[in-house]
């Protein structure tokens, strides 16, 4: 009977050691998973920073800085405004003369709709 009790005790002790080993293995697996996740996150962050640096270099190379863009827009705007001012100065007198002609030189004539209506009804002979 003592050997049975001793055998049971050995089985229980072996089962306890097996459960402890399984728990330790689970803890190690969980730790490795966390570490792998942290390493992957660090790698993703490093790649993201690398791509942002490449984009900024590309943007700098092909687009220039914001100040360059701003000064180019300002120059273009000033050029367009000066062109418009020259156009106004060159055409100002002709526009004034044309407006005065239209306002002062009145040529009374019938409206074309009235003329058409009279032609259709036969009341007007041209």
From Swiss-Prot:
Pfam families linked: V-ATPase_G (PF03179)
Description of the deletion phenotype: Suppression of necrotic cell death. RNAi-mediated knockdown results in increased germ cell corpse number due to delayed clearance of dying or dead cells, impaired phagosome maturation at a late stage and impaired acidification of phagosomes containing cell corpses.
Top-level division of the source organism's lineage: Eukaryota
Disulfide bonds: none
The keyword Ion transport is assigned to this record: yes
Keyword Transport: yes
GO cellular component, one term: presynapse
GO molecular function, one term: ATP hydrolysis activity
Complex and partners: V-ATPase is a heteromultimeric enzyme made up of two complexes: the ATP-hydrolytic V1 complex and the proton translocation V0 complex. The V1 complex consists of three catalytic AB heterodimers that form a heterohexamer, three peripheral stalks each consisting of EG heterodimers, one central rotor including subunits D and F, and the regulatory subunits C and H. The proton translocation complex V0 consists of the proton transport subunit a, a ring of proteolipid subunits c9c'', rotary subunit d, subunits e and f, and the accessory subunits vah-19/Ac45 and vah-20/PRR. Interacts with ced-1.
Function according to Swiss-Prot or TrEMBL: Subunit of the V1 complex of vacuolar(H+)-ATPase (V-ATPase), a multisubunit enzyme composed of a peripheral complex (V1) that hydrolyzes ATP and a membrane integral complex (V0) that translocates protons. V-ATPase is responsible for acidifying and maintaining the pH of intracellular compartments and in some cell types, is targeted to the plasma membrane, where it is responsible for acidifying the extracellular environment. In neurons, required for necrotic cell death by promoting intracellular acidification.
The name this protein goes by in its record: Probable V-type proton ATPase subunit G
Organism: Caenorhabditis elegans
Taxon lineage: Eukaryota, Metazoa, Ecdysozoa, Nematoda, Chromadorea
Gene designation: vha-10
